[in-house]
Amino acid sequence: MEQVTVDGGTGVIDTTSVPTQPELPQSLRIALATGQMRRPLGDTLRPLLDLFADGEYQVTGPERLAEDRYLTPSADWPPADVSRVGYYRTAIKSGHRPVAVVLETTGAAVILDGHHKIAAYREEAILPHLLIISPLG
């Protein structure tokens, strides 16, 4: 678990409502797709964190989704790109653990990135691996 500070954030991602799915830089998309997350997570996730409003946040993971946890999609569900889901299914079957990013607030746990990954995990009957970002305070 890490505590990170956003200073000079754009506020594009609103933690008080269901945000839209953000566009991430390729380097971060690759890290999430492969599950190879470098620490500190605050540095690795900085391009995403800079979309949040200024404040303190907690970043945890990667960790498996709890069986009783419900996730709210920020994009179409189920994902329309079946080939992308298939790509992640193949990766998961071969032992890779791609990581989805979730914004957890008091009202919901919203998928910011990883809709295809989560769909693939579900089709493989494996609990998804998540990075969880939560506002503090």
Regions found by a protein language model. Name each.
Residues 125-127:
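Ligand-binding loop in jelly-roll beta-barrel domains
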Residues 135-137:
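Amphipathic, charge-rich alpha-helical segments that serve as recognition/docking helices
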Residues 24, 31, 40-43, 47-110, ...:
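Short alpha-helix boundary/capping and kink motifs at helix termini
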Residues 131-133:
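Generic beta-sheet signal
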Residues 1-37:
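N-terminal extension/subdomain marker
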Residues 108-123:
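A sequence-level detector for short glycine-anchored, His/Arg-bearing signature motifs
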